[in-house]
């Protein structure tokens, strides 16, 4: 029996001890003394964490993991105490701490937990103050503590909660400015008092950081605000663009140069004023003209050989051709044709040849008959020679196909010599291969840099009082681009105005009477067609409409009677 009792006494008894029993045992054995708080204990109260875990254990698994991590940290403290050489005397000294704590340890703990969990805060890693605190070592610790702590980091990984990391980051920037705690060898009561002061400082810093975090906006919102402003600004620009282009009306100013209140001078006065102006490069222009004048003998020879000469280049060539006429054609029969004149036509050119050169006073049925008679006369009499000098062969009055065809046929005669000038850039487009063979051109570049004084004397100018010559050229140019019915409508109105030109009370032709005349001539079939045609005339400023005292609309051509008579005569000549 004694041996059995001894064996039973030697058998150890096993009893389960929970975490609550361990903590209560620790508190009872310490006798109410305040435990030294390690790195995690600065932010986490063990009793509160355990009570919270007991109450909310069934709510979520994440809080259970936090309790387990806390226990792991407690186990870690055991190994730290062993590494520091602290005595563990049974269960009494398991959780006792023999080394001092410094303010930097809270930051170190946060960085260690962030590294072990694999989630490093980018703000903490980029802060130069944090790197400075990490590199600093406390005076009271031995040099062997660093490798042990590194090993413990790998041994006990823990997950740092988001709210704890946020508080650590916020408190770091405010607590660094506080005075550092200097280590010294003192008694236990002084260490406890200093630990209490550190706890109060940490709590104050955490409260300040929490209050400032509530007041200050997050840094992400500061980055978002400029983007929102840019988007709003871009949206405003888009809306302003569409608002500016939404209206279909185009606002243009009606203040033209014609409304300038300046007295207009006549052509002679303007010419006298321009003649007093001497250009600064007049010497060079004179030398250039002398080079062109040396070609006069060559031109005469080439004309005699059956070629015709065309001059092109920048500047007026009228003075150059006039010098050629006065020096080389004194003893020859020649005709000078001013193509820039608004009233010039092929009919007038042929009349000058038949009347002044051939001394024929008869009439011809058409322009073609007159052309044939002139050609036959020069072919029959080989002794007849004629020099034609045409200024601006590409003018609006001579650039027509019929005009160029007749002039080309005349220049193809052996005893008719043609020398002409062109100024338009696209003047060669007037001639096809057939006309080119008739003219048989020799091209000479004769740049003179002279002003186009005579050529532009008949053009519209705001400084010169104009006669009816310019409206005639404009009238012919516009009507040539219209349909035959449109020309017939305008001819009816023009004839009616010429018939009533001697009536002083004539204010125009009423619209109803004009519509009746157009219907009788089978030109229109409705008043809408006539109004559309009149709108085109009005756009070209060929007609003017006004209402009389009786409210009737009257039509009037704003051109003098002499110009209208010349235009009507030319139209009849071309039709015949």
Swiss-Prot record:
Keyword Nucleus part of the UniProt annotation: yes
Per the record, residues carrying Phosphoserine are 246
Where is composition skewed (Acidic residues) in this entry?
A: 186-200
GO CC annotation: what is one? origin recognition complex
Q: What does this protein do?
A: Component of the origin recognition complex (ORC) that binds origins of replication. DNA-binding is ATP-dependent. The specific DNA sequences that define origins of replication have not been identified yet. ORC is required to assemble the pre-replication complex necessary to initiate DNA replication. Binds histone H3 and H4 trimethylation marks H3K9me3, H3K20me3 and H4K27me3. Stabilizes LRWD1, by protecting it from ubiquitin-mediated proteasomal degradation. Also stabilizes ORC3.
Presence of keyword Nucleus: yes
Q: Would you tell me the protein name for this molecule?
A: Origin recognition complex subunit 2
Database matches in InterPro entries: ORC2, RecA-like_ORC2, WHD_ORC2
Q: Tell me where it resides.
A: Nucleus
Q: Which organism is it from?
A: Rattus norvegicus (Rat)
Q: Where is this region: Disordered?
A: 119-218
Taxonomic path: Eukaryota, Metazoa, Chordata, Craniata, Vertebrata
Q: Which residues carry this modification: Phosphothreonine?
A: 116
Q: Where do Polar residues bias regions lie? A: 149-161
**This protein's UniProt keywords:** DNA replication, Nucleus, Phosphoprotein
Write out the ranges of the repeats annotated as Involved in LRWD1-binding: 1-100
Could you give a GO molecular-function term held by this entry? DNA replication origin binding
């Amino acid at each position: 029996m004694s041996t059995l009792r001894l064996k039973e006494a030697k058998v150890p008894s096993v009893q389960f001890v929970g975490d609550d029993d361990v903590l209560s045992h620790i508190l009872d054995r310490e006798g109410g003394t305040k435990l030294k708080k390690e790195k995690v204990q600065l932010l986490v109260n063990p009793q509160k964490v355990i009570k919270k875990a007991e109450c909310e254990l069934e709510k979520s698994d994440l809080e259970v993991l936090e309790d387990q991590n806390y226990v792991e940290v407690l186990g870690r403290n055991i190994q730290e105490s062993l590494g520091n050489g602290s005595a563990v005397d049974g269960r009494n000294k398991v959780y006792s701490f023999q080394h001092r704590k410094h303010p930097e340890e809270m930051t170190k703990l946060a960085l260690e937990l962030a590294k072990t969990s694999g989630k490093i805060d980018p703000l903490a890693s980029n802060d130069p103050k944090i790197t400075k605190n990490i590199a600093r070592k406390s005076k009271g610790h031995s040099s062997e503590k660093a490798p042990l702590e590194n090993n413990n980091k790998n041994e006990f990984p823990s997950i740092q909660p988001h709210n704890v990391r946020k508080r650590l980051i916020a408190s770091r920037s405010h607590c660094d400015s506080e005075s550092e705690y200097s280590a010294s060898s003192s008694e236990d009561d002084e260490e406890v008092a200093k630990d209490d002061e550190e706890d109060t400082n940490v709590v104050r810093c955490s409260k300040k950081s929490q209050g400032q975090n509530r007041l200050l906006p997050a840094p992400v919102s500061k980055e978002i605000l400029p983007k929102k402003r840019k988007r709003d600004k871009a949206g405003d620009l888009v809306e302003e663009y569409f608002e500016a282009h939404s209206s279909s009306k185009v606002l243009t100013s009606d203040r033209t140069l014609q409304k300038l209140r300046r007295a207009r001078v006549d052509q002679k006065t303007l010419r006298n004023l321009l003649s007093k102006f001497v250009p600064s490069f007049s010497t060079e222009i004179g030398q250039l003209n002398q080079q062109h004048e040396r070609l006069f003998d060559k031109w005469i020879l080439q004309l005699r050989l059956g070629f015709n000469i065309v001059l092109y280049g920048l500047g007026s060539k009228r003075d150059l051709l006039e010098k050629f006429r006065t020096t080389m054609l004194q003893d020859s029969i020649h005709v000078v044709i001013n193509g820039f004149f608004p009233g010039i036509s092929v009919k007038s050119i042929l009349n000058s040849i038949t009347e002044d050169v051939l001394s024929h006073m008869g009439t011809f049925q058409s322009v073609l008959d007159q052309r044939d008679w002139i050609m036959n006369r020069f072919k029959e009499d080989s002794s007849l020679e004629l020099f034609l000098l045409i200024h601006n062969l590409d003018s609006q009055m001579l650039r027509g196909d019929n005009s160029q065809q007749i002039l080309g046929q005349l220049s193809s005669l052996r005893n008719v010599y043609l020398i002409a000038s062109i100024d338009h850039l696209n003047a060669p487009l007037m001639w096809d291969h057939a006309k080119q063979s008739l003219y048989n051109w020799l091209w000479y570049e004769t740049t003179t840099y002279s002003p186009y004084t005579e050529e532009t004397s008949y053009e519209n100018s705001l400084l010169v009082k104009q006669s009816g010559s310019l409206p005639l050229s404009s009238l012919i140019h516009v009507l040539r681009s219209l349909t035959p019915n449109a020309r017939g409508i305008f001819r009816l109105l023009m004839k009616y105005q010429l018939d009533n030109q001697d009536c002083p009370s004539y204010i125009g032709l009423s619209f109803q009477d004009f519509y009746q005349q157009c219907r009788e001539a089978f030109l229109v079939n409705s008043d809408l067609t006539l109004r559309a045609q009149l709108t085109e005339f009005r756009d070209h400023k060929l007609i003017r409409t006004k209402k009389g005292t009786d409210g009737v609309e009257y039509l009037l051509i704003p051109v003098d009677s002499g110009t209208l008579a010349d235009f009507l005569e030319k139209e009849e000549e071309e039709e015949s």
